Amino acid sequence: MVLAFLAAAAGADEPAYGPELEGFDYAFPVQRFELESQRQKLHMSYLDVRPRAPNGRTIVLLHGKNFCAGTWESTIRELTQAGYRVVAPDQIGFCKSSKPERYQYSFQQLAANTRALLDHLGVQRVTVLGHSTGGMLAVRYTLLHPQQVEQLVLVNPIGLEDWKALGVPWRSVDDWHARELKTTAASIRQYEQATYYAGQWRPEYERWVQMLAGMYRGPGKDVVAWSSALLYDMIFTQPVLYEFDRIQAPTLLMIGQKDNTAIGKDAAPPELKQKLGDYPRLGKEAARRIPRAKLVEFPELGHAPQIQDPVQFHQALLKGLLR
Protein backbone atom coordinates (compact mmCIF):
# COMPACT_ATOMS: atom_id res chain seq x y z
CA MET A 1 0.00 0.00 0.00
CA VAL A 2 2.80 2.40 0.94
CA LEU A 3 4.73 1.62 -2.23
CA ALA A 4 1.62 2.11 -4.37
CA PHE A 5 0.96 5.48 -2.77
CA LEU A 6 4.55 6.58 -3.26
CA ALA A 7 4.54 5.46 -6.88
CA ALA A 8 1.39 7.49 -7.51
CA ALA A 9 2.98 10.54 -5.93
CA ALA A 10 6.34 10.17 -7.67
CA GLY A 11 5.50 12.68 -10.38
CA ALA A 12 4.37 15.37 -7.97
CA ASP A 13 6.38 18.56 -7.51
CA GLU A 14 6.71 17.78 -3.82
CA PRO A 15 7.54 14.18 -2.86
CA ALA A 16 5.59 11.91 -0.54
CA TYR A 17 7.46 9.40 1.59
CA GLY A 18 6.40 6.48 3.74
CA PRO A 19 6.25 6.54 7.55
CA GLU A 20 9.75 5.05 7.66
CA LEU A 21 11.04 7.39 4.96
CA GLU A 22 10.39 4.86 2.22
CA GLY A 23 11.28 6.56 -1.05
CA PHE A 24 13.98 8.82 0.37
CA ASP A 25 17.53 7.57 -0.15
CA TYR A 26 20.53 8.20 2.07
CA ALA A 27 23.98 8.67 0.56
CA PHE A 28 25.24 5.48 2.24
CA PRO A 29 23.81 1.94 2.48
CA VAL A 30 21.16 1.57 5.18
CA GLN A 31 21.29 -1.49 7.42
CA ARG A 32 18.74 -2.83 9.90
CA PHE A 33 19.18 -3.95 13.48
CA GLU A 34 16.30 -6.06 14.78
CA LEU A 35 15.60 -5.70 18.49
CA GLU A 36 12.92 -6.49 21.02
CA SER A 37 11.99 -3.67 23.37
CA GLN A 38 9.00 -3.17 25.64
CA ARG A 39 7.36 -6.40 24.39
CA GLN A 40 7.60 -5.27 20.78
CA LYS A 41 9.71 -6.41 17.85
CA LEU A 42 11.28 -3.28 16.40
CA HIS A 43 13.98 -2.39 13.92
CA MET A 44 16.58 0.31 14.09
CA SER A 45 18.01 1.51 10.78
CA TYR A 46 21.60 2.66 10.80
CA LEU A 47 24.63 3.57 8.72
CA ASP A 48 27.96 1.87 9.37
CA VAL A 49 30.57 3.50 7.17
CA ARG A 50 34.16 2.32 7.35
CA PRO A 51 37.25 4.27 6.30
CA ARG A 52 39.76 3.13 3.70
CA ALA A 53 42.63 3.84 6.10
CA PRO A 54 41.33 3.15 9.63
CA ASN A 55 42.78 4.99 12.62
CA GLY A 56 41.22 2.49 15.02
CA ARG A 57 38.55 4.82 16.37
CA THR A 58 34.76 4.81 16.03
CA ILE A 59 32.43 7.79 16.22
CA VAL A 60 28.71 7.40 16.90
CA LEU A 61 26.60 10.20 15.41
CA LEU A 62 23.29 10.92 17.17
CA HIS A 63 20.83 12.97 15.13
CA GLY A 64 18.46 15.68 16.32
CA LYS A 65 14.67 15.81 16.49
CA ASN A 66 14.15 17.07 12.91
CA PHE A 67 17.19 15.29 11.51
CA CYS A 68 18.09 11.74 10.48
CA ALA A 69 21.19 9.59 10.08
CA GLY A 70 21.16 10.69 6.45
CA THR A 71 21.60 14.35 7.35
CA TRP A 72 25.09 13.52 8.65
CA GLU A 73 26.14 12.98 5.03
CA SER A 74 29.02 15.49 4.82
CA THR A 75 30.20 14.75 8.36
CA ILE A 76 30.40 11.03 7.60
CA ARG A 77 32.52 11.75 4.52
CA GLU A 78 34.91 13.99 6.45
CA LEU A 79 35.28 11.59 9.36
CA THR A 80 35.82 8.47 7.27
CA GLN A 81 38.35 10.33 5.14
CA ALA A 82 40.19 11.11 8.38
CA GLY A 83 40.22 7.41 9.30
CA TYR A 84 37.22 7.09 11.62
CA ARG A 85 34.61 4.38 11.44
CA VAL A 86 31.20 6.05 11.69
CA VAL A 87 28.01 4.51 13.08
CA ALA A 88 24.92 6.69 12.63
CA PRO A 89 21.59 5.22 13.77
CA ASP A 90 18.07 6.41 13.18
CA GLN A 91 16.65 6.22 16.69
CA ILE A 92 13.40 4.36 17.34
CA GLY A 93 10.59 6.79 16.53
CA PHE A 94 12.57 8.59 13.85
CA CYS A 95 13.18 8.47 10.12
CA LYS A 96 13.75 4.93 8.78
CA SER A 97 13.27 3.15 12.12
CA SER A 98 10.17 1.70 13.77
CA LYS A 99 7.56 4.10 15.10
CA PRO A 100 5.58 2.12 17.69
CA GLU A 101 2.25 3.61 18.70
CA ARG A 102 2.75 2.59 22.33
CA TYR A 103 6.28 3.13 23.61
CA GLN A 104 7.67 4.55 26.84
CA TYR A 105 10.18 6.97 25.34
CA SER A 106 13.07 8.06 27.51
CA PHE A 107 16.64 9.08 26.82
CA GLN A 108 17.67 6.06 28.88
CA GLN A 109 15.68 3.76 26.59
CA LEU A 110 17.14 5.31 23.42
CA ALA A 111 20.60 4.98 24.97
CA ALA A 112 19.91 1.31 25.74
CA ASN A 113 18.81 0.73 22.14
CA THR A 114 21.98 2.42 20.89
CA ARG A 115 24.14 0.35 23.23
CA ALA A 116 22.45 -2.81 21.95
CA LEU A 117 23.28 -1.78 18.38
CA LEU A 118 26.94 -1.15 19.24
CA ASP A 119 27.15 -4.49 21.05
CA HIS A 120 25.68 -6.13 17.94
CA LEU A 121 28.39 -4.47 15.84
CA GLY A 122 31.13 -5.44 18.29
CA VAL A 123 32.04 -1.81 18.99
CA GLN A 124 33.50 -1.23 22.45
CA ARG A 125 35.13 2.22 22.78
CA VAL A 126 33.53 5.21 21.05
CA THR A 127 33.42 8.94 20.67
CA VAL A 128 29.78 10.00 20.96
CA LEU A 129 28.75 13.04 18.93
CA GLY A 130 25.24 14.38 19.45
CA HIS A 131 23.51 17.27 17.72
CA SER A 132 20.37 19.05 18.96
CA THR A 133 18.14 16.45 20.68
CA GLY A 134 20.93 14.01 19.94
CA GLY A 135 23.01 16.07 22.34
CA MET A 136 20.64 15.28 25.19
CA LEU A 137 20.82 11.61 24.23
CA ALA A 138 24.62 11.78 23.99
CA VAL A 139 24.81 13.19 27.52
CA ARG A 140 22.55 10.45 28.85
CA TYR A 141 24.53 7.77 27.00
CA THR A 142 27.81 9.10 28.38
CA LEU A 143 26.44 9.12 31.94
CA LEU A 144 25.14 5.56 31.59
CA HIS A 145 28.29 4.17 29.94
CA PRO A 146 31.26 6.23 31.16
CA GLN A 147 33.76 3.43 30.56
CA GLN A 148 32.78 3.12 26.90
CA VAL A 149 32.87 6.81 25.93
CA GLU A 150 36.36 8.18 25.30
CA GLN A 151 35.10 11.62 24.21
CA LEU A 152 31.77 13.45 24.10
CA VAL A 153 31.03 15.99 21.38
CA LEU A 154 27.95 18.21 21.66
CA VAL A 155 26.87 20.26 18.65
CA ASN A 156 24.25 22.88 19.51
CA PRO A 157 22.57 20.52 21.95
CA ILE A 158 19.11 21.46 23.10
CA GLY A 159 18.27 21.11 26.76
CA LEU A 160 20.91 23.56 27.97
CA GLU A 161 18.03 25.14 29.89
CA ASP A 162 14.99 23.58 31.56
CA TRP A 163 12.07 25.08 29.64
CA LYS A 164 9.47 23.60 32.00
CA ALA A 165 11.14 25.01 35.11
CA LEU A 166 11.48 28.41 33.43
CA GLY A 167 7.72 28.58 32.88
CA VAL A 168 7.12 27.30 29.36
CA PRO A 169 3.58 25.83 29.42
CA TRP A 170 3.27 22.05 29.35
CA ARG A 171 1.53 20.47 26.35
CA SER A 172 -0.21 17.12 26.41
CA VAL A 173 0.80 14.48 23.87
CA ASP A 174 -2.58 15.02 22.22
CA ASP A 175 -1.84 18.73 21.87
CA TRP A 176 1.59 18.01 20.40
CA HIS A 177 -0.04 15.58 17.98
CA ALA A 178 -2.57 18.17 16.81
CA ARG A 179 0.27 20.64 16.31
CA GLU A 180 2.37 18.16 14.35
CA LEU A 181 -0.51 17.28 12.00
CA LYS A 182 -0.34 20.87 10.74
CA THR A 183 3.27 20.46 9.58
CA THR A 184 3.97 21.57 6.00
CA ALA A 185 7.04 22.19 3.88
CA ALA A 186 6.46 25.92 4.29
CA SER A 187 6.34 25.72 8.10
CA ILE A 188 9.46 23.55 8.19
CA ARG A 189 11.33 25.87 5.83
CA GLN A 190 10.39 28.98 7.79
CA TYR A 191 11.50 27.46 11.08
CA GLU A 192 14.76 26.07 9.72
CA GLN A 193 15.73 29.34 8.04
CA ALA A 194 15.17 31.30 11.25
CA THR A 195 16.76 28.78 13.61
CA TYR A 196 19.10 26.39 11.81
CA TYR A 197 20.67 28.79 9.32
CA ALA A 198 20.60 32.20 11.05
CA GLY A 199 18.20 33.71 8.53
CA GLN A 200 20.10 32.43 5.49
CA TRP A 201 18.80 30.06 2.84
CA ARG A 202 20.57 28.05 0.16
CA PRO A 203 19.10 25.59 -2.36
CA GLU A 204 20.91 22.62 -0.81
CA TYR A 205 18.92 23.03 2.42
CA GLU A 206 15.69 22.18 0.59
CA ARG A 207 16.49 18.48 0.45
CA TRP A 208 16.20 18.25 4.23
CA VAL A 209 12.93 20.21 4.22
CA GLN A 210 11.43 17.76 1.74
CA MET A 211 12.78 14.78 3.68
CA LEU A 212 10.62 15.79 6.64
CA ALA A 213 7.66 17.22 4.74
CA GLY A 214 7.46 14.14 2.54
CA MET A 215 6.53 11.96 5.52
CA TYR A 216 3.64 14.33 6.30
CA ARG A 217 2.40 14.04 2.70
CA GLY A 218 2.55 10.27 2.73
CA PRO A 219 0.17 7.52 3.88
CA GLY A 220 1.76 7.39 7.34
CA LYS A 221 1.23 11.05 8.23
CA ASP A 222 -0.65 10.27 11.44
CA VAL A 223 1.93 7.68 12.54
CA VAL A 224 4.73 10.20 12.01
CA ALA A 225 2.85 12.99 13.82
CA TRP A 226 2.01 10.74 16.79
CA SER A 227 5.59 9.54 17.08
CA SER A 228 6.78 13.15 16.96
CA ALA A 229 4.34 14.07 19.73
CA LEU A 230 5.60 11.29 22.00
CA LEU A 231 9.17 12.41 21.38
CA TYR A 232 8.44 16.06 22.13
CA ASP A 233 6.95 15.01 25.46
CA MET A 234 10.16 13.12 26.26
CA ILE A 235 12.36 16.07 25.32
CA PHE A 236 10.32 18.59 27.31
CA THR A 237 9.99 16.54 30.49
CA GLN A 238 13.40 14.83 30.78
CA PRO A 239 16.15 17.45 31.28
CA VAL A 240 19.76 16.30 31.46
CA LEU A 241 21.50 19.60 32.35
CA TYR A 242 21.26 18.98 36.10
CA GLU A 243 23.75 16.13 35.67
CA PHE A 244 26.36 17.96 33.58
CA ASP A 245 28.75 17.96 36.53
CA ARG A 246 28.78 14.13 36.48
CA ILE A 247 30.17 13.88 32.93
CA GLN A 248 33.61 12.27 33.15
CA ALA A 249 34.58 12.23 29.47
CA PRO A 250 36.49 15.11 27.87
CA THR A 251 33.81 17.13 26.12
CA LEU A 252 33.95 19.25 22.98
CA LEU A 253 31.07 21.75 23.01
CA MET A 254 30.43 23.30 19.59
CA ILE A 255 27.94 26.17 19.52
CA GLY A 256 26.55 28.19 16.62
CA GLN A 257 25.93 31.54 18.30
CA LYS A 258 22.92 32.50 16.17
CA ASP A 259 20.91 29.52 17.41
CA ASN A 260 17.71 30.36 19.31
CA THR A 261 16.13 26.92 19.71
CA ALA A 262 13.80 26.36 22.67
CA ILE A 263 11.16 23.63 22.86
CA GLY A 264 7.70 25.12 23.41
CA LYS A 265 8.86 28.68 22.77
CA ASP A 266 5.82 29.28 20.56
CA ALA A 267 3.56 28.74 23.61
CA ALA A 268 5.64 30.79 26.05
CA PRO A 269 4.49 34.21 27.32
CA PRO A 270 6.16 37.12 25.46
CA GLU A 271 8.39 38.21 28.33
CA LEU A 272 9.77 34.65 28.65
CA LYS A 273 9.95 33.93 24.94
CA GLN A 274 12.57 36.62 24.34
CA LYS A 275 14.85 35.12 27.00
CA LEU A 276 14.76 31.53 25.76
CA GLY A 277 17.34 29.94 23.48
CA ASP A 278 20.15 32.39 24.25
CA TYR A 279 22.93 30.12 22.98
CA PRO A 280 25.86 32.53 23.50
CA ARG A 281 24.99 32.47 27.21
CA LEU A 282 23.87 28.85 27.39
CA GLY A 283 27.01 27.51 25.73
CA LYS A 284 29.27 29.30 28.20
CA GLU A 285 27.17 28.13 31.15
CA ALA A 286 27.31 24.53 29.95
CA ALA A 287 31.08 24.73 29.47
CA ARG A 288 31.44 25.88 33.09
CA ARG A 289 29.27 23.04 34.39
CA ILE A 290 30.85 20.20 32.42
CA PRO A 291 34.14 19.37 34.19
CA ARG A 292 36.38 18.72 31.15
CA ALA A 293 34.68 20.86 28.54
CA LYS A 294 36.26 22.82 25.71
CA LEU A 295 33.97 25.40 24.07
CA VAL A 296 34.17 26.21 20.36
CA GLU A 297 31.93 29.06 19.18
CA PHE A 298 30.79 29.85 15.63
CA PRO A 299 29.75 33.53 15.74
CA GLU A 300 27.72 33.60 12.51
CA LEU A 301 26.16 30.13 12.50
CA GLY A 302 22.83 28.80 13.73
CA HIS A 303 21.48 25.53 15.09
CA ALA A 304 22.96 23.31 12.36
CA PRO A 305 26.57 24.47 11.82
CA GLN A 306 27.53 21.17 10.21
CA ILE A 307 25.07 21.90 7.38
CA GLN A 308 25.27 25.69 7.24
CA ASP A 309 29.07 25.88 6.97
CA PRO A 310 30.47 22.35 6.69
CA VAL A 311 34.02 23.49 5.92
CA GLN A 312 34.34 25.65 9.04
CA PHE A 313 32.54 23.10 11.19
CA HIS A 314 34.54 20.05 10.11
CA GLN A 315 37.86 21.85 10.47
CA ALA A 316 36.95 22.66 14.07
CA LEU A 317 35.63 19.14 14.70
CA LEU A 318 38.72 17.35 13.40
CA LYS A 319 40.94 19.72 15.35
CA GLY A 320 38.97 19.10 18.55
CA LEU A 321 38.81 15.30 18.41
CA LEU A 322 41.22 13.42 20.65
CA ARG A 323 44.24 12.02 18.86
Regions flagged by a language model, labelled:
Residues 108-126:
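Conserved acidic catalytic loop of the alpha/beta-hydrolase fold
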Residues 139, 143, 152-183:
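Flexible "cap/lid" loop of the alpha/beta hydrolase fold
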Residues 33, 217-288:
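Conserved serine/cysteine hydrolase catalytic core
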Residues 183-245:
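Conserved alpha/beta-hydrolase catalytic His-Asp/Glu region
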Residues 280-323:
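Catalytic active-site module of serine/aspartate enzymes centered on a nucleophile-bearing elbow/loop
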Residues 19-49:
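N-terminal cap/lid segment of alpha/beta-hydrolase-fold proteins
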Residues 38, 42, 47-96, 316:
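Conserved HGGG/HGGXW glycine-rich cap/lid loop of the alpha/beta-hydrolase fold
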Residues 31, 70, 91-107, 163:
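Glycine-rich "HGGG/HGxG" loop immediately N-terminal to the catalytic nucleophile
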